[in-house]
Amino acid sequence: MIDFQNVSFSYGEESSGGGIRNVNLTINTGEFVLLTGESGCGKTTITRLVNGLVPHYYEGNLEGDVLLDGKSVSDTPLYDLAAMVGSVFQNPKSQFFNVDTDSELAFACENLGYPQEDILKRIDRTVSDYHIEDLMGRSVFALSGGEKQKIACASSSVLLPGIMVLDEPSSNLDMAAIDDLRQVLSLWKKQGKTILIAEHRLYYLHDLADRVLYVKDGEIEREYTPAEFDSLSDGTRKEMGLRPFSLSKLKPANQYQAHTAKQMEFQNFCFAYKKREPESLHIPSAELPVGETIAIIGLNGAGKSTLARCICGLEKKCGLLQVDGKTLDWKARLKHCYMVMQDTSHQLFTESVTDEVLLSIDNEDETVVDKILKQFDLLEYKDRHPLSLSGGQKPVSYTHLTL
């Protein structure tokens, strides 16, 4: 059982932005609880309080107590918590400690000094339960996003923890990989594990969650049964900043047509990361309208990121690209293109959001910076370290800063 007893937490001296206030919450053994809410509302902090990253790793001001089966998280060493709570994060790469899948599955057991025979038995059982025989003996760098998340789920459960905590595990996955993730969650639920998951993408959790908790400004504002949550009107859901609980409720956005005859043309747009390897990108010819919003879709590993890197000039030798008849080499594309990466932590360089803005503009007047931040609802975070922003706030802030 997980028990929050009047818990408040803020990062450093910050009183807002990802912290929580006066949270009282009991999650019973075997219960599946979904945390949802807008980016920066405090969902991730709640998960960190359960797996012990707060306060053992992330420092701040903590009041109240979190109990796991009667044991205080604050008083329990992380190595003991690791056997009690399994964690799966938004970016599985952030929790890998080894370069191959076999070693990754063995790592937690080895770290706690389990006998070799026991480790091998646990790995064999985990591989069988998760149907990942084809992923064993592989480099983690050669796995697709969905395959990495499978290994993350498997490695986090080798110790047989009774509690599983997940923080937006589907954010980088395609439909097929999300379906695989749902099957893992279903397995955990059948095994009687207590599951706490923070998510924006909700449809795949339909019929799995026992309770839905809506978090706003660091507080659990509302609690729903799945039926109550599913019955929310579109207007109410949009006011709450939430996605639909069912794909059948998705509606197309308003159509927009750019009034321009300009075209972006691709000729022999091909790329391979290494010589003698199959091409990751092969576009003999294509035309796209300039001035429109275009979605590049496809399965994990299909070449979407490679295409974006080539368009932006991050890869040099990839064929011909013309805009309105003018050829743009890779240097010209670097000047005219901006790219927001999957993990925007790689693109944030300074000690504060204010300094990050100053990197992007010629004017060093902080009043100009404040005006920009206010325009995009980022002013309250001006003195925060960019890497301390939530997973949803980082790409939003970087996108606005590049503009």
Q: What do the PLM-derived regions correspond to, one by one?
A:
Residues 1-4, 9-22, 54-59, 77, ...:
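A short, flexible loop at the N-terminus of ABC-type nucleotide-binding domains that lies
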Residues 51, 312:
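Helix-to-loop junction immediately C-terminal to a conserved catalytic motif
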Residues 117-135, 366-381:
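Conserved ABC ATPase "signature" region
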Residues 139-143, 147, 385-389, 393:
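Conserved ABC ATPase signature
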Residues 199-200:
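H-loop/switch region of ABC-family ATPase nucleotide-binding domains
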